[in-house]
Curated annotation (Swiss-Prot):
This is UPF0246 protein BP2452. It comes from the Bacteria. PANTHER family: PEROXIDE STRESS RESISTANCE PROTEIN YAAA (PTHR30283:SF4), PEROXIDE STRESS RESPONSE PROTEIN YAAA (PTHR30283). Pfam families: H2O2_YaaD (PF03883). Belongs to the UPF0246 family. HAMAP family: UPF0246. GO terms for biological process: response to hydroperoxide. The lineage of its organism: Bacteria, Pseudomonadati, Pseudomonadota, Betaproteobacteria, Burkholderiales.
Amino acid sequence: MLFLLSPAKKLDYDSPVHVETHTQPLFVDQAAALIKVLKTKSADEIAELMSLSPALAELNAGRYGAWKRSFTQANSRQAVLAFNGDVYEGLQADTLSARQLDWAQDHVVILSGLYGALRPLDLMQPYRLEMGTRLHTPKGKNLYEYWGSGIAEYLNERQAGAKAPVIVNLASEEYFKVVDLKTLKARVVQCVFQDWKNGAWKVISFHAKRARGLMARYAIAHKVARPEGLQGFDSEGYAYDAAASSADKLVFRRKQA
């Protein structure tokens, strides 16, 4: 069973890293080709393409310029420790043990506009390239066309030996869309996190993002091997709602935010 996560815009390359173990990213050729396209753009063009402030556009133009095909601990850090948004505040990877990170390495995949798919301990150079970016490349007019069926094929390879492969989607719609479902062989299980607000159950973006990270942490801590094993998730007041759920859609709700 594999768990899919979105990346984060917010990055942390300053905090001390508590594990030395690292691996090399798998889609370096594809990332290098994207960097080649991005390097042709001025900071103003990047600002327009990605709706960034001039300062952020300059920062990322500099990142593309500094990007190298060789990933070292000097220019990179492990992906799960570099990402620092809402999902990763829920995951709190900096408090996972080396053994837990090893389990995550085998069961968690982080989707990425630049790197395609990252394992938690894959080294990653800093970047900004959201999956929804309309970046024109020789392969098409956006990143979905660029990655094509490649991510789904990779996920198939990862579960080639499984009798009943399962993908648990904890990624956003923007990122999960890069997984070509016609190519994917695995059963997909969605996790939905809802809060009670104004008399109704609603998905509140900030809370849902954090909850996806909390769920990934729960799966890692309990080495969850089947979707049913996720039903015990109870972090920060969430509880599984059997009546609102189905076999492939697990709904978790809470009344206090």
